Curated annotation (Swiss-Prot):
Disulfide bonds: none
One Pfam family per UniProt: BAR
GO BP: any one term: endocytosis
Biased amino acid composition, Polar residues: 337-373
Keyword Phosphoprotein among record annotations: no
Keywords: Cytoplasm, Cytoskeleton, Endocytosis, SH3 domain, Virulence
Gene name of the encoded protein: RVS167
InterPro entries in alphabetical order: AH/BAR_dom_sf, BAR_dom, BIN3/RVS161-like, SH3-like_dom_sf, SH3_domain
Location within or outside the cell: Cytoplasm, Cytoskeleton
Function: Component of a cytoskeletal structure that is required for the formation of endocytic vesicles at the plasma membrane level. Plays an important role in virulence.
GO-annotated cellular components: actin cortical patch; actin cytoskeleton; cellular bud tip; mating projection tip; medial cortex; mitotic actomyosin contractile ring; Rvs161p-Rvs167p complex
Name by which UniProt lists this protein: Regulator of cytoskeleton and endocytosis RVS167
Domain of life where this protein originates: Eukaryota
């Protein structure tokens, strides 16, 4: 916008606000308002015709191109992967030669169909799209003329308001008289300009309306029959699709189910698919389970102590423990059994109190019914259900349980879903782990 246009816009701004809020005197022409309404309808119809014809032209071309690309993708899926493209025997179909042949035949049919529809699509572009674009250019020029007419109306109302302000004064000075005469001259000029553009549009718009009835309506009719011809061609060519691989006589869902077979069961039997399903659970649910496992007390309560005492792995408590020397400790290290210890160590750390010598203890031996030393207790002896790890698992987040393949894990809490997150204990550590990594 030039500086002159910006200046005019500032001068017209107050009158524009008054016109929007219907304040003061506003110049109106009922004949022009009706013509303006019809002109807007023509403008909208022409834009719609241009946009819809473009969309249809691009949609048909895009649909055919996508069908060709789809057939190419299916053929690539059926073809085996080969690292030597120069070897002719490397590209021999090994999996589904019928599927490759069907995809190539379908690709050829679609290419032929695209060549058949090419003249019809070009006819749409020449007979519909291009004429609609030319009509839009004419409408845009008329719209500029209508905007100029609206600006002249604002100027006329603005000058009339200025003139009425001086005329309403009861006592006018000489300076007011000069301004009033100047305002009268401006009103006359603005009235002439407004009448020129207003009469021009009122005389020319009916001609456009007559041309519209002779131009736009036939375009819609032509567009309809062109679409009908394209749909008929698509229907007839697809109905004549003679590819033995496709059974077009049966229901499409039944044919798909028959060709699919038991592929879902075979896929579920692969271990890697269960791995993906297990880790595809909601992160929020996994986080809740980790926090629940971290906040729950460890399973080393009275039940585990009782089971340890009854199992016989550790010696019983001796009443004279405070007076016994260091060598009389009843603790058995789980790393090595008593049968492989030296005589000195066996006499001091592993042997019962009955066999302690007076020299070593400094007091008479006490008879305590203790079980002889045995092998170290197994990792799992708390009475909880256990499971065996099928794979190695490394903790992915805080609260996870790490274990190697073959490890025996105590199950503290489990879900009904084998792919869920279970809570267990291994090697003194408590945490959560995926249930599909273990076997009961």
């Amino acid at each position: 916008m030039s500086f002159k246009g910006f200046k005019k816009g500032v001068l017209r701004a107050p009158q524009t606000m008054r016109q929007k809020f219907n304040m003061g005197e506003i110049t109106q022409d009922a004949v022009y308002l009706d013509a303006e309404r019809r002109f807007k309808e023509i403008e909208m119809e022409t834009k719609k015709l241009s946009e819809e014809s473009k969309k249809y032209f691009n949609a048909v071309n895009g649909m055919l191109d996508e069908q060709i690309d789809f057939a190419k993708a299916v053929a690539e899926i059926y073809k085996p992967i080969s690292g030597r493209l120069s070897d002719p025997s490397a590209t021999v179909p090994e999996d589904n030669p019928q599927g490759i042949e069907a995809s190539e035949s379908y690709q050829a049919v679609v290419k032929d169909l695209k060549d058949t529809l090419k003249p019809d699509l070009e006819l749409i572009e020449k007979r519909i799209v291009e004429p609609a674009q030319e009509l839009l250019k004419i409408i845009q020029a008329i719209r500029k003329m209508s905007v100029k007419r609206d600006h002249k109306q604002l100027d006329l109302d603005r000058h009339k308001r200025n003139l009425s302000k001086y005329e309403s004064k009861k006592e006018r000075t000489v300076k007011d008289e000069e301004k009033m005469f100047s305002a009268q001259a401006e009103v006359e000029i603005a009235q002439q300009e407004y009448d020129y553009y207003n009469d021009l549009l009122k005389n020319e718009l009916p001609v456009l309306f007559q041309m519209q009835s002779d131009f736009i309506k036939p375009l819609f009719v032509s567009f309809y029959y062109m679409q009908l011809n394209i749909f008929y061609t698509l229907y007839t060519r697809m109905e004549e699709l003679k590819i033995p691989y496709f059974d077009l006589s049966t229901d499409i869902v039944e044919a798909y189910t028959a060709k699919k077979g038991n592929i879902e069961e075979q896929t579920d039997a692969i271990g890697i698919t269960h791995f993906k399903v297990g880790h595809a659970k909601s992160k929020l649910e996994a986080t809740k389970r980790r926090h629940a496992a971290m906040n729950s007390p460890p399973p080393t309560g009275a039940s585990s102590i009782a089971s340890t005492g009854t199992g016989g792995e550790l010696p019983a408590y001796s009443p004279g423990g405070y007076n016994q020397p260091y060598g009389d400790s009843k603790y058995q290290p789980p790393s090595s059994p008593a049968t492989y210890q030296s005589p000195v160590v066996a006499a001091t750390a592993q042997s019962p109190a009955t066999y302690q010598s007076p020299v070593a203890t400094g007091q008479p031996p006490s008879y305590l019914p203790q079980t002889p030393a045995s092998a170290p207790p197994p990792q799992v002896g708390s009475g909880l259900p256990t499971c065996t790890a099928l794979y190695d698992y490394t903790a992915q987040a805080q609260g996870d349980l790490t274990f190697p393949a073959g490890a025996v894990i105590e199950i503290i809490q489990r879900t009904e879903d084998a792919n869920g997150w279970w809570t267990g204990k291994y090697n003194g550590q408590t945490g959560v782990f995926p249930g599909n990594y273990v076997q009961l």
